[in-house]
Amino acid sequence: YSVGNEIQEIGTERGAEINRMLCNAFKELDATRFTTNGMNALNAVGAKVYPVMQELAPLIRKDAGEAGTNDNSGSNAINSFMKLMEGEAGDAFAVHPIVTEVLEESSESMDIIGFNYLTGRHLLEGELHPNKCVLGTETFPADIARLWKVVNSSKRVLGDFTWTGYDYLGEAGCGIFYYDGKSNFGSNYPDRT
């Protein structure tokens, strides 16, 4: 049973407590099924993301191909956040000690630790929780080839779910994908009307 997906409060003391209560409730009702939760560390770390971004700024700029820019406003700020979900900067974010601290209590409650966009964390979890399995609950299509190597190299990683409806018609929100060079994951005219 999945007790949630990208719940912001999962990284708080109260959120971890609720996660534990839900996992325990499912176990009481049906002890034959495993529990999981699709945790997104970018959501879970909250305001703690800023010191992490400061520390990872060189990797974020390298991944973005913007080594000379220090502009953290507007779309640059959004792009910096998005870089924490993919590539080298995403992997460094995934294993950052602050992320580990924030996710630890909730990870302990579930049977299978579920991660959204945290490919770099899958192998670390084998060390932190050797008696648990990991499941990728959301991954970008561009990362799936790299991720699949991780899945195949570890007996603790069960597999992964990736976005397959990447550019499906009818997307009304931030999932809009453009092939003509426009910024992805934001709505451009006429989609925004």
Where are these regions (language model features)?
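Extended substrate-binding grooves/exosites of carbohydrate-active enzymes
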Residues: Y1-T193
